Amino acid sequence: MISEARLLQVILAPHISEKGTLSAENHNTMVFKVAGTATKAEIKAAVQKLFEVEVTGVRTLNVKGKTKRTGQRVGRRSDWKKAYVSLVEGADIDFAGAE
């Protein structure tokens, strides 16, 4: 059993992008920015508990940070982890209506 405190730390934010929006509309899949140490089981449990929906699958990937320049200095953005969460048919998560 995963502790409730850990579940609240797993999902950092929804990832809003053109690809994510199309995925949500066509394949009932939501995209989240998650903690780098989060496992698929933790992500599934967190989504089910926080949004009260049934999850059918979780796919994760590590996004590498881009190299960016500010004047003459060269910096690098942080790496982060992204999760594609598939929901059962008919389930939906409404981020706009969330408070």
Curated annotation (Swiss-Prot):
Gene Ontology terms: biological process: translation
SUPFAM superfamilies recorded: Ribosomal proteins S24e, L23 and L15e
A Pfam family it matches: Ribosomal_L23
Entry GO CC: ribonucleoprotein complex; ribosome
MF terms in GO: rRNA binding; structural constituent of ribosome
Protein keywords: Ribonucleoprotein, Ribosomal protein, RNA-binding, rRNA-binding
Superkingdom, taxonomy of origin: Bacteria
Annotated HAMAP family: Ribosomal_uL23_B
Record's function text: One of the early assembly proteins it binds 23S rRNA. One of the proteins that surrounds the polypeptide exit tunnel on the outside of the ribosome. Forms the main docking site for trigger factor binding to the ribosome.
PANTHER family: 60S RIBOSOMAL PROTEIN L23A
Assembly, per entry: Part of the 50S ribosomal subunit. Contacts protein L29, and trigger factor when it is bound to the ribosome.
Family the UniProt entry places it in: Belongs to the universal ribosomal protein uL23 family.
NCBIfam families associated with the record: PRK05738.1-1, PRK05738.1-3, PRK05738.2-4, PRK05738.3-2
Entry protein name: Large ribosomal subunit protein uL23
Organism: Psychromonas ingrahamii (strain DSM 17664 / CCUG 51855 / 37)
Upper lineage: Bacteria, Pseudomonadati, Pseudomonadota, Gammaproteobacteria, Alteromonadales
